[in-house]
Curated annotation (Swiss-Prot):
The keyword Transcription applies. The keyword DNA-binding applies. InterPro entries: Cro/C1-type_HTH, Lambda_DNA-bd_dom_sf. Residues 42-100 form the HTH cro/C1-type domain. Signal peptide: none annotated. One of its GO terms (molecular function) is DNA binding. It comes from the Bacteria. It holds the Pfam family HTH_26. Residues 53-72 bind DNA. This is Uncharacterized HTH-type transcriptional regulator RC1195. The lineage of its organism: Bacteria, Pseudomonadati, Pseudomonadota, Alphaproteobacteria, Rickettsiales.
Amino acid sequence: MKLSRLFDPCNKAGNTRLCIYLSFIYSEVINMALATKVKEFLEEKLKQEKIDRKYLAEVTNIPYTTVSRIMRAEANREFNPEIDTILKIAKYFNCTMDEVIKRKVQNNS
């Protein structure tokens, strides 16, 4: 269940400001978590593969500035990598997007 469904002040009249504020906070938490997870994945893989940011940018066709912003995820709270960027990273390292964002996939067996 999504966090936004657990507490949704938007359902009640007169809570417009609270709704906007909570939506902003919720998106900040989600975005920060995503950016940090991609950063952690890249730190690990760049070290394992013994490659640098510039090389990764060249071979994936991701702008170097984007790679740098990902690597500064904690310092730059407003940045969130785009899906296309995450996909390019996953393709290069031959893994899934779920692995890049460290998302645990539930098995529905």
